[in-house]
């Protein structure tokens, strides 16, 4: 038996790439034959994967196909005759990008149409959240369905952080953080509005740090910059691309993590913030609540001024912060590799190893 993971793009440092690599390493540890194939492979992870064109199917293979976008591979994968499982990471609805990037909108819409092709043609589906599996159920998939969180290698977070960033963030200002692609579904404009009222009413000695890249959605990024200028708002930082050591520094120096996303299939940064015991406030949407659990405060339909008030109360309530940290530590245990990998082994039919 071989476990064959297939992705369209095997990237370095992104959540799905890290997830696939962790599965691969854990399978190898258990002496299970494991391979990763992709159409596009980042040079930094080239040693772990081969091009999809080089894959030669064997009858006892089990393919785990990672679906997160629209691409030609979504059709090609169904030509294989071995056992096929779908790892569904969710696809952002295209309407979020209509105003900013028609190409991304088209890709997202294509991906959601492609998802329907897998109905009755795969042996099982793994969704990284109940939210994702609910989408699969609504399409009437007739196969085994599993909700298993994404695998996160927490050892990576023990690496040395960037000393220069740590120094720059240690100037006495309160650091309000969000980590995620600069994209309309992440709703960074809401974060800017929240921060505007928080800084104006409660704490002028604070900054908002938006970690992430526009990555093809520059029109949205420029809109955010114009909005900041219109508000005459100081201390809003767009970091752009960062090294991993720099990202670690931002988490370590964060006073508060705020998430206003309107669509999330899992949201790895919430888990990262919990790992670093950063107090969290998040909007209730998609898989946010099930990922966060009791590790933060969930808000529903709060205005920016109301959110700013909650931010202030949390920042000034040490008792609530301490309880939140205890809950975060308990919650993180649910995402540990050993626990999650046991579930993947069962779904893949390797639970005897």
Region roles according to the model:
Residues 221-245:
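Nucleotide-activated donor-binding/catalytic signature segment of Leloir-type glycosyltransferases, i.e.
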Residues 270, 279-282:
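Short hydrophobic beta-strand element within catalytic cores of glycosyltransferases
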Residues 262:
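Aromatic "clamp/platform" in nucleotide-sugar-dependent glycosyltransferases that forms part
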Residues 119-160:
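Donor nucleotide-sugar binding/catalytic pocket of nucleotide-sugar-dependent glycosyltransferases
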Residues 39-42, 207-222:
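Glycosyltransferase donor-sugar binding loop
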Residues 297-305, 313-318:
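Conserved acidic donor-binding segment of nucleotide-sugar-dependent glycosyltransferases
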Residues 249-254:
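Short alpha-helical donor nucleotide-sugar binding micro-motif in glycosyltransferases
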Residues 126, 167-186, 192-195, 209:
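Conserved donor-binding/catalytic core segment of Leloir-type glycosyltransferases
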